[in-house]
């Protein structure tokens, strides 16, 4: 028997399971935010690990605030049918969003607004990775608020609002290949260009500081992505289940393909490569999981794994320090997913929700779908790049809105300079050792003393002693000895 719920501010009734499905979907999409934080933190160096978690979480707070005030109204106004570019402010502050948006809806508009709010938050959180190890946090939050208003809201209106030009034209974008993946990738890449490269001397022997965090973040993202894609059906139906399975198929083939490519060159089974491939497959599934066939998703994951793997080299040709490879893994994979909608989109898959009618793509002989998808991709890239560049340019002339931290702060790390707290606060860090005025002979003597103590600790450990101490009773452990005035940049 159908469950019914009556809203407190309206006499309209809603389908209870549908409302619960949307709220659960919103909650699990939000769970992707800490996943992104852990992923970015693990890929960075230790001295900026906490700052990346902070910036991803704060981006979510900014996204919710913007969405409540005017974001939802600009992206989904139902009273602006003649405007194909952006909505109006009729729903400012979630005004009049408590009833049904359309008569045939089985859920309140507030549930839909809340669900879409989490998509906006994920979009901003992806962009936040562009600040990695060198971006000031306050200007970036201002940037995100403005970009959400004049960047994300218009592109979302194009594709998901009934008044948008891409929606009316029949472009296929299931869960945000253009307004989320391409927009975040292009915006992050342009923002990285304005920030400039990190200090190359500090990047010697650079490697992710915690691959376990990378794996944890990827796993959380995959978990949230399943509802990110399947809940985009807005009701628990066959199409949502189909999108769930398509997401898994694209992710596994993407991960396997990327991992094999890395093994071919390094002869090692890279965990970071595996995670990168999984993410590329998930991103490709975002616009296509509710539109293409299951075998199409298998092929899509392979293509995404190969193309995105090689696309990580684009930043070197463009001379842009895209530290988190946002362009390769989100932008390129998002384009692949949108193209696959034209290649493998099927009318019978799209119609599985029982309400949507579309001719599909080449699988069902709708060959004109390709140029529509390409036009949408080009519009999303061009508009996002222009808006991002304008915002960054203007912010650069506003006092206090300098985008980048100083060279000294970059050497110290964003955790110390921007946060004042540390992800790994084991000991007090002194970075002014080169100003102490101690002669090199004294420093070498101290190094030799530490080496001898380390050997002594190792000998005692091998004889059954778990720890040792020097003559002053201080605990000793083996440590890596570096030349005078040199610090291992990969472990900072």
Curated annotation (Swiss-Prot):
The chain's coiled-coil residues are none
Tell me which UniProt keywords the record has, alphabetically: Ammonia transport, Membrane, Phosphoprotein, Transmembrane, Transmembrane helix, Transport
One Pfam family from the UniProt entry? Ammonium_transp
Q: Map out region (Disordered) in residue numbers.
A: 455-492
Give the transmembrane ranges. 19-39, 50-70, 110-130, 141-161, 175-195, 211-231, 241-261, 269-289, 291-311, 332-352, 374-394
Source taxon at top rank: Eukaryota
Q: From the UniProt record, give one GO term of the biological process aspect.
A: ammonium transmembrane transport
User: Which spans does this entry mark as compositional bias, Low complexity?
Assistant: 461-473
**Residue spans, topological domain Cytoplasmic:** 40-49, 131-140, 196-210, 262-268, 312-331, 395-492
Membrane topology is: Multi-pass membrane protein
A single GO cellular-component term from the record reads: plasma membrane
Q: Which residues lie on this side of the membrane: Extracellular?
A: 1-18, 71-109, 162-174, 232-240, 290, 353-373
Q: Which cell locations does it reside in?
A: Membrane
Give a short account of what the protein does.
Transporter for ammonium (both charged and uncharged NH3 and NH4) to use as a nitrogen source. Can also transport methylamine. The affinity of MEP1 is about twenty times lower than that of MEP2. MEP3 has the lowest affinity.
Return the similarity comment: Belongs to the ammonia transporter channel (TC 1.A.11.2) family.
**Protein name, please?**
Ammonium transporter MEP1
